[in-house]
Swiss-Prot record:
Transmembrane segments: none
Species this chain originates from: Scolopendra alternans
Keyword set includes Signal: yes
Signal peptide feature range: 1-29
Example GO molecular function: toxin activity
Recorded GO CC terms: extracellular region
Protein name per the record: U-scoloptoxin(16)-Sa1a
Keywords in alphabetical order: Disulfide bond, Secreted, Signal, Toxin
Family to which the UniProt record says this protein belongs: Belongs to the scoloptoxin-16 family.
Amino acid sequence: MAPPSNPLFVVLCWALFAYLMLVLRDIQAAERQYRTESRDGKCVGEDGLLHAPTELWYNDNDCSEHTCVNDNTGYYEIIRRCTLIVYPPECHLMNGTGTRYPKCCCKVTCELN
């Protein structure tokens, strides 16, 4: 069965594809929250160091941002990392433009003919 050749259908498909690419471009961060050990009123971070509540720190080796939070249930480390991006064959990944999160995250670029 041949794909539809109606020009309006083709334009609508490309418009939907372009919209989805814009949405995917903006959804780059994956955020996870982990309960963490605490010591002296501070979080023991993934890096093994002590971090005060609301402190923000980075791991430039894995392009991530970390925050220590404390609520009435305990201490947590919030970790933000780049997400895996799924993209069509006519697109490709470009390296991030910086060394620190989120600028180090890859971006998808597409060339529409």
